[in-house]
Amino acid sequence: MKNTDPVANTKIYLATSFFNEEQRARIPQALAQLEANPTVGVVHQPFDFQYKDARVDSDPAGVFGSLEWQIATYNNDLNAVGTSDVCVALYDMDQIDEGICMEIGMFVALHKPIVLLPFTKKDKSAYEANLMLARGVTTWLEPNDFSPLKDFNFNHPMAQPFPPFKVF
């Protein structure tokens, strides 16, 4: 018997850049789709769990950027990656972020699926994806389209390993 009934028990790690307004605006759009998905139980969004509530725009404890904050942030993210089932990466192809690359690499090393939603202002035919990213991602979605996150089966994440870009 095939078990294909959706169960809301998958923990998603939502990896995203947070450096400009455009990147930050993607988060609620992704969350809306993921929260409507019947196979998603929990979405871990790292910016909701900042060490001592330290953020770029608000730092009540005065620790943002310090070694203490760096170590805590790294370890908190590492723990969240370890306890998550699937990574959903909102990947800005036009403004590469080493942090999200590191998170993707951790999921690859742990043999956990990565669903990558690329964002680019370029035409697909004008972009080239790095082979390390291209081959590490389990499932590539079409650029700039949040809608597949609502219906994707995170209980049984099937591979779609071909990026919508040329690979170099």
Swiss-Prot record:
Record keyword Magnesium present: no
Record InterPro entries: Nucleoside_deoxyribTrfase
Signal sequence interval, chain numbering: none
Chain's role: Catalyzes the cleavage of the glycosidic bond of 2'-deoxyribonucleosides and the transfer of the deoxyribosyl moiety to an acceptor purine or pyrimidine base.
Protein known as: Nucleoside deoxyribosyltransferase
Active site, per annotation: E103 (nucleophile)
Top EC class for this record: transferase
